[in-house]
Amino acid sequence: YAQSGLLAEVHPSADFKAKLSDIGWEATKYNGKQIAYPIAVESLSLIYNKDLVPEAPKTWEEIEKLDKDLKAKGKNAIMWNLAEPYFTWPIISSQGAYAFKVTANGYDAKDIGVNNEAAQKGLQFVVDLVKKKVINADTDYSVAEASFNKGETAMTINGPWAWANIEKSGINYGVAVLPTL
């Protein structure tokens, strides 16, 4: 629509722009022009069962150690939806991968950073977690959600849309930033 000239530039006031995140405003620009208002910004996070993990781990090394301890009790440290790249993207991009290169004029859709060395390093980290049996390669959303909500898994990577089901399940949970690599 923007390329065809079907969208008009919008001019929000400075006061209004200050109420929303810069990343939301940047995501709604085209060729340096503000063509939309950001309506939602969500983020994935580490959701953890406080009864199994009193404090969220800060590193993946902690998660690997925790997984060994929990597996001895018939539980898992972490599961998340590996069927959809969205849920693994924070790990892949943590090494410098990007969907589109950010330029002074916004995003360059011709410069895709999902097959660069940084993306490969991030993805290799996930592959290594599978090889170490910390995670299962065939885990999808429903498997990860059910396991966490039954108290069988200590942590999951998910977003705010998952909180209602977690609350219905009675899990005593916390939300934290994802661990560093």
Set out the residue ranges of the language-model regions.
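Hinge/lid segment of periplasmic solute-binding proteins
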Residues: 1-44, 55-64, 72
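Extracytoplasmic/secreted proteins, especially bacterial periplasmic and envelope-associated proteins
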Residues: 5, 48, 58, 62-65, ...
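Extracytoplasmic/periplasmic substrate-binding proteins
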Residues: 124-181
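Short, solvent-exposed loop/beta-turn-alpha elements that line the ligand-binding surface or hinge
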Residues: 11-20, 70, 98-121, 168, ...
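Short helix-loop capping/hinge motifs at secondary-structure junctions, enriched
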Residues: 51-59, 98, 132
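Extracytoplasmic/periplasmic solute-binding protein
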Residues: 33-39, 44, 64-111, 153
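Ligand-binding "clamshell"
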Residues: 3-8, 31-33, 94-95, 166-180
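Glycine-centered hinge/linker elements that transmit conformational signals in sensory
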Residues: 66-67, 108-138
